[in-house]
Amino acid sequence: RSLYGGTHNLLESTLSRIGNTTTYEEPRDPAAFAAAIQDNTKLVFGEVLGNPGLEVLDIPKIAAVAHAHGLPLLVDATFATPYLCRPIDLGADLVMHSATKFLSGHGVVIGGVVVDGGTFDWMANDKFPTLSQPYAGFHDLVFAEEFGPQAFITRARKEGIRDFGACMAPMTAFQILQGLETLPLRMQRHVSNALAVAEFLQEHPMVESVSHPGLSSHPDFEFAKQILPLGAGAVFSFELRGGREAGRVLIESLELF
């Protein structure tokens, strides 16, 4: 309930085919993250705002857990955007966004962003040989020696784009940059609109529950003010009384989308 379905499918169905395994824990429990780390663990991952439960990730504490075990913390900040949350300032090492959503703002492109804070020492242990050992594809270059904390993002560009085709079209990049120009203004309105609708639904007799960290009924209401001081996001989930049939009726009755 706290991980985007596409990400779960990538971890569980795609990466598992090439030998990667994933252990899942509740985002509110840093101790559980610590207990789940194994000798072969390479990365700790979480979403600033879980999808669809909207749980708020305790970035500082989970970053401390990851770093204590010599691991980087990767955070998906798609729902939060850089306007509402700065994960690197809170301890994350890597941040990813689906730029299709709030960053571009118009739903006309498909793209993603990876941000490397340059905070992780890839030479600190032997868990990352692709960065700490010679790479034949670049004349035995050792990325971590040559580029230091920027080794990850450099290899992502030099190898990932070159060999795996993750190269954004120029027009797509242009449209995302255009969207970024209005991100602060749009997020302010997105946040206020979402909270207004969530408050309305919370009082509606046909609604069983609403999950949004901006509501006092949400378990992370107070904590969200620390991680997301400018607003608890513009996405919420809700459950209807009447189950699946009630959901069908609601969707088919919508006149404005």
Where are these regions (language model features)?
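Conserved C-terminal alpha-helix-loop-beta "cap" of PLP-dependent enzymes
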Residues: 202, 206-257
